[in-house]
């Protein structure tokens, strides 16, 4: 693939880094602590979710199903990728010696793309579900909401996996990245690398943008109903407000964690002159920027469960007591029905 890499597998690029430099960059204790905190956070969120699903309404049950899918994805992402990265940081093995055929690198590249895109796609799916639930409450059969939610989660997983497998089918490449402890898509000039990098960045960015648009409309609708001429019995339920607060939190976390990396990938593959030399080497600045943005993106897997844990109704009521004292409504449907009748 690269002129001076004929004796190596297709996942190896030139990378000038000493063992001492790798030790300074890749702290095994930090990586292990990071993974343990993330795994514990997601397990805690799963236990809270299991309790919340008992006796929940149809709309809330569907939303909690999406949340379960999101937390499970984050947990498995930390578990699988963390096992590889933490082992590499402790042992400091040479990837060429352990994985000359690039099988491990290809596997890690697939799961990095899969577990990276899934939270963004699930966020967009959750935003769509809440948008329809708030603005079109009669457009879907309530009895099928939970089954439909799991089907949607499965489709998201399948779509992200299909995208992650593209480099194994010849569209782009997965290569070992600086400082030699992880694999990801290649920020090169090859048409396949450019196409795959742009596809990954655009799909992630569109998911974030779609979440922002639909969540904004949903929040505006809730505010209109809440502050309109509706009686107390026609105002949004506490759970409607709770779900939107959690969804907005998930969207903000995903935007802060992932948008820098997505923008950086798009800018780098489109950069002129190219960021990667003909020999397959990136500048040290570009390599370090990619590593920093990737580390920021991985915080999404730790922060997601805490958005649900901290933004539950019981916690919100501590800071906003009015939420527990005001009259609880039956649903949004009376007000929305009246509006649709008028129009």
UniProtKB/Swiss-Prot annotation:
GO terms for biological process: adenylate cyclase-activating G protein-coupled receptor signaling pathway; inflammatory response; positive regulation of blood pressure; positive regulation of cytosolic calcium ion concentration; positive regulation of vasoconstriction. The keyword Magnesium does not apply. Interacts with RPGRIP1L. Interacts with RACK1; the interaction regulates TBXA2R cell surface expression. Residues 1-29, 88-106, 173-193, 271-289 are extracellular. This is Thromboxane A2 receptor. Belongs to the G-protein coupled receptor 1 family. The lineage of its organism: Eukaryota, Metazoa, Chordata, Craniata, Vertebrata. The gene is TBXA2R. One of its GO terms (molecular function) is thromboxane receptor activity. InterPro entries: GPCR_Rhodpsn, GPCR_Rhodpsn_7TM, Prostanoid_rcpt, Thbox_rcpt. The modification Phosphoserine is found at residues 329, 331. The chain crosses the membrane at residues 30-52, 67-87, 107-128, 150-172, 194-219, 247-270, 290-311.
């Amino acid at each position: 693939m690269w002129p001076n890499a004929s004796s190596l597998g297709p996942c190896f690029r030139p990378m000038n880094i000493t063992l001492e430099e790798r030790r300074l960059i890749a702290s095994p204790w930090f990586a292990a602590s990071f993974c343990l905190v993330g795994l514990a956070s997601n397990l805690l969120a799963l236990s809270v979710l299991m309790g919340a699903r008992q006796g929940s309404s149809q709309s809330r049950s569907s939303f909690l199903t999406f949340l379960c899918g999101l937390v499970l994805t984050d947990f498995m992402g930390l578990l699988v990728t963390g096992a590889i990265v933490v082992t590499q940081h402790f042992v400091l093995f040479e990837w060429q010696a352990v994985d000359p055929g690039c099988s491990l690198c290809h596997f890690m590249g697939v799961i990095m793309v899969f577990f990276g895109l899934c939270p963004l796609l699930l966020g967009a799916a959750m935003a769509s579900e809440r948008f329809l639930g708030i603005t079109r409450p009669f457009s879907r059969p309530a009895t099928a909401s939970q089954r439909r939610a799991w089907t949607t989660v499965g489709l998201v997983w399948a779509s992200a996996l299909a995208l992650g497998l593209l480099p194994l089918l010849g569209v782009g490449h997965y290569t070992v990245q600086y400082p030699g402890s992880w694999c990801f898509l290649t920020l090169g000039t090859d048409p396949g690398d450019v196409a795959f990098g742009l596809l990954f960045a655009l799909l992630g960015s569109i998911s974030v943008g779609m979440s922002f648009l639909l969540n904004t409309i949903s929040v505006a609708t809730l505010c209109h109903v809440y502050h309109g001429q509706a009686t107390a019995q026609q105002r949004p339920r506490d759970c409607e407000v709770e779900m939107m607060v959690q969804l907005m939190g998930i969207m903000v976390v995903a935007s802060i964690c992932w948008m820098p990396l997505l923008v950086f990938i798009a800018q780098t593959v489109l950069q002129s002159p190219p960021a990667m030399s003909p020999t397959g080497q990136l500048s040290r600045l570009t390599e370090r920027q990619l590593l920093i943005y990737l580390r920021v993106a991985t915080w999404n897997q730790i922060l997601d469960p805490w958005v649900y844990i901290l933004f539950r109704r019981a916690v919100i009521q501590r800071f906003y007591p009015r939420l527990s004292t005001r009259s609880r409504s039956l649903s949004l449907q009376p007000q929305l029905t009246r509006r649709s009748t008028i129009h």
